[in-house]
Regions:
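A charge-rich, low-complexity, intrinsically flexible signal that marks solvent-exposed coils, linkers
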Residues: 280-283, 287-316
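Post-HEXXH active-site segment of zinc metalloproteases
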Residues: 78-115
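Auxiliary, metal-adjacent structural segments of Zn-dependent hydrolase domains
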Residues: 1-49, 62, 103-105, 124-126, ...
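Short pre-active-site segment immediately N-terminal to the catalytic Zn-binding motif
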Residues: 53-69
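Non-catalytic, well-ordered alpha-helical scaffold segments
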Residues: 67, 71, 106, 111-118, ...
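Pan-zinc metallopeptidase signature
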Residues: 139-264, 277-294
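Short helix/loop segments within enzyme catalytic domains
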Residues: 119-143
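Active-site recognition of the HExxH zinc-binding catalytic motif
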Residues: 64-84
Length: 319
């Protein structure tokens, strides 16, 4: 793995890199770990935090390195900005189940980011017609994976792949997909309509779209006779509220729900803080189950939202 210095990067990438570092006080290091790639995919550059102030980016596609690097830097910039995020502090007790829910949620989350990133990459010149063609070739290959799945699960999988292809590929292959995969196309169309009904640069609308797409995807799963994924109570999604709401008592906006899952940190019963307007958990509370009594609820609910958020260290965004 080779570290890339700024003098080895295109001018536009260096400028993007320096803007992020200056705006957010982070140091970003770029590494090349090139491998043979049959298709261009959006995960051929990835990043991870290295302590509080360092972010490491690793690129694996040499031919399209400028595109995948610019793409990953746009993801980093969105994550560092005022954008809602997904977290999870509970467990089903089965690692595979936990991973499946998080994988789906993260896929939807990244697709929502892609709705903004595709516009940025067209504007900065890194997403050309040639790159789009290669990206869509990869999506087409992903829609016919070399794995055995039953029909319903193949449709669930294709729906998420197609959703991302519609968003980042700007509907260019819709006609082919509708012909070849009509049911998955119908499902994906329902989801992409939610994407396109919201201004995803606005945190409140990004969160609304995220919750609504997960809801719609869950309905697709249930309609095929499978058990739902419990996105509302398994995941926490950053709340976006007004300053006025911070002064309200907790029970005016949120309710505490004794979770069907266990607190991952303690192994004990978990308690979710659920938004009353959309039923989505915003946090897993640090409560001792032995002390959660009717009297506790009565007293806890009288605290202001701001007091609870501060006491429970709950991240929030102002609408």
């Amino acid at each position: 793995m080779k570290k890339l210095n700024n003098n080895e990067l295109p001018t536009n990438i260096v400028k993007q890199l320096e803007n992020i570092e200056q705006q957010y006080g982070k140091k970003i290091e770029i590494y090349a770990d090139y491998t043979d790639q049959e298709f261009l995919t959006l995960d051929q550059a990835n990043h991870q935090a290295k302590g509080e102030d360092m972010i490491q980016v690793i690129i694996t596609n040499e031919k399209y390195n400028d595109f995948v690097l610019a793409h990953e830097l746009h993801h980093i910039e969105l994550e560092l900005s005022d954008e809602p995020s997904i977290s999870c502090a509970v467990t089903t007790g089965k690692q595979d189940n936990d991973g499946r829910v998080l994988s789906i949620a993260n896929s939807v989350f990244e697709t929502l980011e892609h709705a903004t990133i595709v516009k940025e990459q067209i504007a900065d010149g890194t997403f050309t017609d040639a790159v789009k063609a290669e990206y869509l070739r990869g999506i087409d290959a992903a829609l016919t994976p070399k794995v055995q799945l039953d029909l319903a699960n193949m449709r669930f999988y294709r729906t998420l792949i197609m959703l991302d292809g519609m968003v980042f590929g700007q509907h260019e292959h819709d006609e082919d997909w509708q012909h070849n995969f009509p049911t998955s196309f119908k499902y994906a169309t329902k989801l992409v309509e939610i994407v396109e009904q919201n201004d995803l640069t606005v945190p409140f609308q990004f969160r609304r779209a995220l919750v609504n797409i997960l809801d719609a995807y869950n309905e697709i799963i249930i309609s095929n006779g499978y058990q739902g994924m419990h996105f509302h109570t398994f995941l926490n999604i950053t709340p976006v509220i007004s300053k006025r709401q911070l002064r309200l008592s907790l029970n005016q906006v949120y309710q505490i729900k004794h979770s069907e899952f266990k607190n991952r940190a303690t192994g004990k019963d978990a308690f979710d803080l659920i938004a009353m307007n959309d039923g989505q958990s915003i946090a897993t509370l640090n409560l001792d189950p032995a002390k959660v009594t009717p009297e506790f609820y009565k007293a806890f609910y009288q605290h202001t939202i701001e007091e609870v958020f501060k006491g429970e260290d709950i991240k929030y965004l102002i609408r």
